Structure formats: structure tokens, C-alpha cells
């Protein structure tokens, strides 16, 4: 009986092993295919990931707590995808994994928001580790010296060039000379959108050029799409994506129209203290999200979209509002984000791509 039982046991073990071998690729595929961007915000008292009052990097306009915001609930929500759970950010693991590497954010003040968030997340993990901050031209660098990690920001709001010429400041939709600053990076996170709608004194160019055609202005969404196409061609023709991993930060939304989140009386994010607790934003996605996804779809080389628009749309409560740059005499900043806050989640998702 013993030998027969052993034979049955061995046969069962063999069948189980074969089943596991067959299922492993499917399990791996399920993990790889996890949708990190569809989910909801849940209250979690283990958040935020760092104390904003002790982070030395946060600029005045993002430092809501220091600027007197009395409620701190906005920093105690965790993003929970419907189909999986994000690995919690581990700063020490991130530093070790990226030892000696160069990571650069390229874009506007939303890139600044995310860059400072990641710097705080890392600093809180190794508070006694030496760091330096240097600025050269448009590029600022936090260096975590013990790990040789350079965390960079290139302030480039359009990604394409603005050139001063005799005729004025020309926005060249088909030119990327700043790309020379990006090619040596190990990881790049790009972003552009918010400046494309600027007009008047806030607009940093006088003319738009495509090829030999120069014009005073054009449809801004069309210009945005052309610039993204130029950037995409640069990725395909210049960047070595075997050396450099490329991400694109999705469109970061603003909250200036309460009707879009089902509160018609609200003229902006001022006074908002709770996120939307569902999985969808009543006003839907802004049109520029489709433009961005269409442009990314034309790129041959691998580019990962950090598709943070919907999860950020649900956070009408998390902007600086009157606790930002303009203070309480302003109409309120409903475009940028308090730190700690929503950009920490963008970086947790980035961490799940880069480390996990």
C-alpha cells in the first residue's frame, strides 16, 4: 500500500507542477497587466508618506500646511486600483535600485510639483543622508550623495523650442534643441499641456513657426499635437530607449468649474475638503487627454504613459487653493497640488513601474 500511495502522491505532485508551469505565464501576465489608473481614493491613516513641515524641498506655493491650511485630510487618502494593490513606496529600495543613476523630469510647474514630491519621499526615507541642490541654466539637480542618485528637473514648458529672433520670440513646433540635455539620462518623465492655452503677458512667445511657415497664432490644441509629434519623432530617432526608460506624465487636471464634479455652486476648488469617492469624474476626461494618447500611439519606441488624469480629477480637495502662492487674497490655485498630496501617488505609481 505504501508504494502505491507514494506513486499516487508523486503523480499528483507531477500534475500540480505541470499545472503551475502552465499557469505561471498567465499569473505573470495578470500582474503585468494590472490597471493602476482605475480605482478610488480610500482613507488611510498611515498616509501621508512624509511630513511636509519637515521636508526641506517644498516650495512656498505647494506648502499648504505651512501656509495655514487647517485641514490635513487631503494628505491622508491612498489610491486603491480596482484590480490590484499598489506596492507602498519604499524610498530606500528606490535609492538602492537607482544607485548611480540620473532621473530627470522635463516639463512645466506640474513636473516641478512631482519632482519636489519625489525628493521629499526619498529624503524622508534617509533623513540623515547628505544631499545637494544645484542649478545650471534651466536644470536643477538634487543629488543624494550616498547613493549617487541625481534627481533632475529641466523646466521646459512646451518641450519644443522658443528661439529669440529679430522678428520676436518664436515657438518652433518642429524643433527640439533641448534634447541634448536629455539623452544621457537613465529615466525621463516628460510633461506638457498647461502653458498651451496661455495668452497675453503670460504667453512667452510672439510667433509660431512650422517649417518655413510663420504665423501669429493658431489653434492651441492643434499646436500641442504637432509639438507632441515632434517630441515623438525625437524619441524614435535620437533617444536610445535600451539605455533610457521614458515616461510621460499624463494631463494633470484643474478644478475651476464645480458643475463638472456635480456642484454647480462651486466656482473653484476653494473650500473643498473631500475627494470624489467614486471611480469616475462626472465631467469626463478633458479633450487634451485623447490628443496625448493619439500622439503617444504613433511612437515606435517604448514610452509609458502615467495616466494620472482620472485619479487626479477625483481630488478637487487637494489643490493649494488660497493656501498657495497668492495667499488668501487670491482667487485660489486649483491647478497645482499641495505637498504632501496627489503627486505622491503619481510617484508611487512611477515606483511600481521602476522598482517593483
From Swiss-Prot:
Membrane-spanning ranges: 12-31
Protein's UniProt keywords contain Membrane: yes
The name this protein goes by in its record: Protein trichome birefringence-like 41
Protein biosynthesis as UniProt keyword: no
Membrane topology: Single-pass type II membrane protein
Function comment: May act as a bridging protein that binds pectin and other cell wall polysaccharides. Probably involved in maintaining esterification of pectins. May be involved in the specific O-acetylation of cell wall polymers.
Pfam family, one: PC-Esterase
Alphabetical UniProt keywords: Membrane, Signal-anchor, Transmembrane, Transmembrane helix
Gene responsible for this protein: TBL41
InterPro entries: TBL, TBL_C, TBL_N
Motif (GDS motif): 107-109
